[in-house]
């Protein structure tokens, strides 16, 4: 835990950006969930005891799957793949976009407490926002009409948003941030990706 606190103090700017992004994701999710509740004529609180317990369970499963990541053979070594979004997607379909964002946040928080960070929070921020770019649109679409057909459409919408956002986020923020963190020219990082 001391190592994590030391990393936080050394990377205050990234931590502040991370916190601002978390707040932004929560606000978007709240607006979408309230809109879906209004359209469907539902008036239940965003959080209740049952939801909080389920958020904890889905987050724990997601964190375990997140820790069991593996490298992608066709990408640079710092890109990893895991299946941690699956339980979060199921949980957000069941409990809404706000619960999905909360699960993403708790997953990353648990991972940081157990494993720490090796990327000065850059990779953790990336995992959170790219995960939210899948979870928020998918669960929002599904929240408006909970049918099998709409679940498929929601997954397609979430995948499209995640792909477009993830690509842009990599180009505009992540790759330059990794370049700065590792002290490598951006061209060298891009060359690592094109080598494979």
Predicted regions: what they are:
Residues 1-196:
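Loop-helix junctions at membrane interfaces
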């Amino acid at each position: 835990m001391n190592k994590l606190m030391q990393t936080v103090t050394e990377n205050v700017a990234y931590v502040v950006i991370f916190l601002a992004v978390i707040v932004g994701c929560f606000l978007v999710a709240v607006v979408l969930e309230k809109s879906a509740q209004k359209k469907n004529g539902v008036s239940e609180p965003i959080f209740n005891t049952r939801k909080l317990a389920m958020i904890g369970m889905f987050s724990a499963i997601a964190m375990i799957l997140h820790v069991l990541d593996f490298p992608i053979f066709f990408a640079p070594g710092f890109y990893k793949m895991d299946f941690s979004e699956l339980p979060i997607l199921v949980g957000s379909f069941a409990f809404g976009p706000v619960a999905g964002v909360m699960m993403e946040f708790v997953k990353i928080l648990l991972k940081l407490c157990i494993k720490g960070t090796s990327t000065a929070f850059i990779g953790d921020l990336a995992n959170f926002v790219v995960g939210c770019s899948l979870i928020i649109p998918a669960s929002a679409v599904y929240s408006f009409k909970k049918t099998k057909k709409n679940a498929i459409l929601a997954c397609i919408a979430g995948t499209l948003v995640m792909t477009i956002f993830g690509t842009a986020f990599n180009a505009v923020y992540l790759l330059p941030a990794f370049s700065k963190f590792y002290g490598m020219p951006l061209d060298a990082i891009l060359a690592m990706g094109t080598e494979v």
